[in-house]
Amino acid sequence: MVHVETQKIRNKEQSPRVAELRQELRRKIAAHAPNAGAHATAILGLTLYRRTAPSPCYPAMFEPSLNVFVQGPKRIALAGTTYLCDESTFVLSSIDVPIVSQVVAASEDVPLLSLLLKLDMAVVREILSQEEFHAYDGSSPVRGIAIGKTTVDLLKPCCRLLDLPS
């Protein structure tokens, strides 16, 4: 039997500025994505998502990307661990990763809203080559994705991306 561990990224009290930026990002995504579905933008690799109904679990492939959730819960399963993502989380994938995904709750009135920015790995490698890193010590599992809490430093550039002309 496979052990399944569920993790929820704890939504500790976040600053009023994080809440304000999240609300601004919600408004911008809702304006650019007025209907359910995936909405390409003028920015190569930037897609906005609006889901208006829960979904069954479905297999998907996470490409190298940054996915920022701003409204609604989504469940992501990877390698025996299930993560519950919500408006306080982001998912960063550095490699192609097979996952199982599910929109947990969404409606016309309160849709799941998120943005996904595909990463150009050649650019990432170039940036990383300019930094000094310590060798991986093996202290944590390597899964190909990282899930964390959104911050002002992440939400501000996301808001600026959606200010660019379409």
Language model features with spans:
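A short, N-terminal "cap"/entry segment at the start of jelly-roll beta-barrel domains
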Residues: 1-42, 47, 55-56
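Amphipathic alpha-helical segments enriched in hydrophobic/aromatic residues interleaved with Lys/Arg
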Residues: 4-19, 126-166
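Short flexible/disordered coil segments
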Residues: 21, 105-110, 160-162
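N-terminal regulatory/effector-sensing and dimerization cores
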Residues: 39-136
